[in-house]
Amino acid sequence: MLAISYMRDEIAPRLQEIFHAEQSAAPITQKEGTEATPLVKEKPAPQQVESPSTPRTAKTATSIKPIAMPELPQMQSAKENYITTHSCGEVRNYTVCYSSIHHSPLWVAAPMHRSYEGDTKRKDNYTFDPTLPVNVQTRLNSSYGEYTRGHMLGSAERNASRELNDQTFYVTNIAPQLREGFNQMGGAWNNLESFVDKQVCADTLYLVTGAIYEPYTDSNGELIPARTTINKNDEQEVGVPTAYYKVMLRTRSGKTGRSIAECTSEELKCAAFIVGHRSAKGRKPSAEDMLSVRELELLTGIDFFATVPHAPETEADPKDWGL
């Protein structure tokens, strides 16, 4: 059970800290229990994102205010996209950006720490997200048909309590995934999830899991075209991702005992991994699948770790991640 009273921001980040965030966390506009609103990006003057050609400089963060939700991305507003944050009491679970066009998530951002893990058993109770309009969601009582129901934030990563786990079964956290060679039994995505799980440390790991729906050329040169599927549960057309990615930010040592804001850029590391949505049993994370965060930003148009100006987003060294 989560020891809420004794957790720091870096151990089990608190939802209440949203209200103490700097203006750069402003994309989250709704509170828990209210209807989600379309994503709106606000560019704060103190932490504007540099152009891709401008290098980030190493700087200490001792004078920076606490960063409430370091994992949050920012992106251009679009009326078809909705974001909402789910929490359990004072402890936040995850934030999702959901596309009402694809009827599937664009990204899910979450803090990762062993304190979120326990022995709660999954119930597979796939249900509508109570904070979004039902008419923009798709029903998932069973699999899509051709594709399995793939978690963006895994059920196994949130089993410290019943409520934490149940929230991972909201349909806004689910996207179509190939079963064989991808989602299960040593598939490419299954192996990447295992790799990311090994990066969880004493300090908090900040993670964004995302999906791409435009045509994508995988690292082996295979072009994966844009596609859709008909969800057999409600006959709704659902976008099928052409690629999935994970973006990570954490301290290098993993055991500083300090918040991200208190660390220098030299004490941090971040990287992105992307895999084409195709059957590739045995495929494991490699340097070929690795990008710098800045490179993924150029590919997706999303500003990752937007509230962490000293994150080393232009760096991506495979050796830093044991590759």
Task: Give the location of each predicted region.
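Domain-level detector for secreted/extracellular nuclease and nuclease-toxin modules, and
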Residues: 1-323
